[in-house]
Amino acid sequence: MHLPTLSLVEELIARRSVTPDDAGCQALIAARLAALGFEIHALPHGPADARVDNLWAIRRGQGDGPTLVLAGHTDVVPTGPLERWHSDPFVPSHRAGLLYGRGAADMKTSLAAMVVAVEEFVAAHPVHRGSVAFLLTSDEEGPAVDGTVKVCEWLAARGERLDACIVGEPTSVRQLGDMIKNGRRGSLSGRLTVVGQQGHIAYPHLARNPIHLAAPALAELAQQRWDDGNEHFPPTSWQMSNIHAGTGATNVIPGELVVDFNFRFSTESTPESLQQQVHALLDRHGLEHRIAWTLGGRPFLTRPGSLTDALSQAITAVTGLRTELSTTGGTSDGRFIAQICPQVVEFGPVNATIHQVDEHCEVAALGPLKDIYRRTLEAMLA
């Protein structure tokens, strides 16, 4: 175990930072970074009743070198049923070499390891090249509209150059270091409304049943091959998540059918091309329809280069593992950072219990995680 990292992650877990509440996590981290000579910028955003806390902190070195950003979120998801937890989710607890608490894996362990890694790096290299920065938000587990995306807009307006970024998401699968995420698929959601005509169920000739009308089109959408993917991404997928029609009465043909759906799309497709294909298919089926579209994020990919090399080599040096680069899984705030930063990867602890009751991480992995971050800093900035 590594006591400085353990102590900090316990302090962070003890703060009830259920999204979008930061609960003082960023102030705690900012104080430690300020002591290292970081410029601190608190960037709150959003309405007063749902304020999001954001933090940008940067330590500028001397001479040429990249700006390496360590990014993450201080918010956590709700606990779920407290009675199912074996201990209070906001009281750090140890059992059998595991640290339990909400955020233990996603992602307060990564934040603590990053902070301590930077403290060790600055102590060893007080005069370093390039810059090291932190980008933190309390709006990753929520709508993600007042968090990282707003900080990125602010950074772009200031002309701040970002060269590389590590997002501390829990990417490891079976053991620390076995996977780096070097990209993510895009996410495009839609709410489809198919218009029919309400009527009595005994007189279908006087009505138009939107369920019956839409069924063939929905079946075709589910079977459609949108693209073939590529060496980095699987083929684009389309999935329905919710279907609703009817008044609740059993003798009424509904007037509308509402379907929620989502694309997870590769770099072989664009939001515009997918939207066009969906509308064309529905038109071909003769459906009167409308769709409210929401673009959650475009896909991004960081090809092997200086950042993936430095991080991969650090993982091998600390764990002995040869890591895997992968683009699987859901979206993260990396999708926003990738719009202003050419190299974005995600790396953190094992993700087996994230968002679950009794979320936990392995205490013995805290030191190695911190060492991996520190070695990456040294490779790029020392």
Curated annotation (Swiss-Prot):
Keywords: Amino-acid biosynthesis, Cobalt, Diaminopimelate biosynthesis, Hydrolase, Lysine biosynthesis, Metal-binding, Zinc. SUPFAM superfamilies: Bacterial exopeptidase dimerisation domain, Zn-dependent exopeptidases. Zn(2+) 1 binds at H73, D106, E169. One of its GO terms (molecular function) is acetylornithine deacetylase activity. Pathway: Amino-acid biosynthesis; L-lysine biosynthesis via DAP pathway; LL-2,6-diaminopimelate from (S)-tetrahydrodipicolinate (succinylase route): step 3/3. The active site is at D75, E140. Its cofactor is Zn(2+); Co(2+). Catalyzes the hydrolysis of N-succinyl-L,L-diaminopimelic acid (SDAP), forming succinate and LL-2,6-diaminopimelate (DAP), an intermediate involved in the bacterial biosynthesis of lysine and meso-diaminopimelic acid, an essential component of bacterial cell walls. HAMAP family: DapE. This is Succinyl-diaminopimelate desuccinylase. It comes from Leptothrix cholodnii (strain ATCC 51168 / LMG 8142 / SP-6) (Leptothrix discophora (strain SP-6)).
